[in-house]
Design a protein with these regions (language model features):
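Short, solvent-exposed, polar/charged sequence segments at loop or secondary-structure edges
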Residues: 86-129
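Secreted/luminal cysteine- and crosslink-motif detector
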Residues: 13, 27, 112-115
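N-terminal secretory signal peptides that target proteins for export/translocation
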Residues: 1-22
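C-terminal/domain-edge helix-coil "capping" segments
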Residues: 44-59, 79, 87-88, 116-121, ...
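Glycine- and acidic-residue-enriched helix-capping/strand-helix junction motifs
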Residues: 62-76
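Bacterial Sec-dependent signal peptides at the C-terminal "C-region" and cleavage site
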Residues: 37-45
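Bacterial N-terminal signal peptides
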Residues: 25-37
Length: 191
């Protein structure tokens, strides 16, 4: 029937004009498109993700030396971090193979910014490094650092304590840092 309101039709049958509901729906749709366009990154930042390093200050480390299970975990942490950053779409990973041997031979946390110089040499805008600090088999800490490759400035530093020297504790801690710090919206943004 003409003039009857149909929930799925928002054009007035008499005048053929938009009703106030239709205007509201259109303006909301346009607003959402605008907001998404404004907050969408202009490009994925290029990043060099270096392998995690172990800082072992435990008595066990002094007595027994390097543990193969911890070395394997460090490699897996690095792979998982790279994969998650790539999958996020916010970062474009740069191949660090040309500088990998030099990075492995350095203490990236104590080399006076060599990580940013290495990142710059492979064309990255950012350098990401990470450490696992082991106090004992019970008390460990994971850190991730994001630095600007051109200036060397630290853009973000994130840290989380973990309990237990197991695969599960290491990977859950990395997952938490990625979700709640590294890829969290507006983490570290000063307003």
């Amino acid at each position: 029937m003409i003039g009857e309101r149909n929930a799925s039709v928002y054009i007035c049958p008499m005048s053929g004009r938009f009703t106030s509901r239709m205007r509201l729906a259109c303006s909301l749709a346009v607003s959402w498109v605008f907001l998404l366009a404004v907050h969408a990154p202009t490009h994925a930042q290029t990043v060099a993700v270096f392998d995690f390093e172990l800082i072992d200050t435990s008595v066990e480390g002094e007595i027994r030396g390097v543990r193969s299970d911890e070395q394997a975990r460090l490699g897996q942490l690095s792979l998982q971090l790279r994969e998650r950053l790539k999958d996020s779409g916010r970062f474009s990973l740069v191949d660090i193979a040309p500088v990998a041997a030099e990075a492995r031979a350095s203490n990236l946390q104590g080399c006076g910014g060599c990580d940013t110089r290495l990142a710059g040499r492979v064309g990255a805008e950012l350098s990401i490094t990470g450490t696992v600090q082991k106090v004992s088999n019970l008390i460990l800490n994971m850190n991730i650092y994001v630095r600007d490759a051109s200036s060397g400035a630290t853009l973000a530093a994130m840290s989380a304590d973990m309990r237990g020297n197991t695969d599960e504790s290491w990977f859950r801690t990395l997952d938490w840092l990625i979700r709640n710090r590294l890829l969290a919206p507006d983490y570290g943004v000063r307003r």
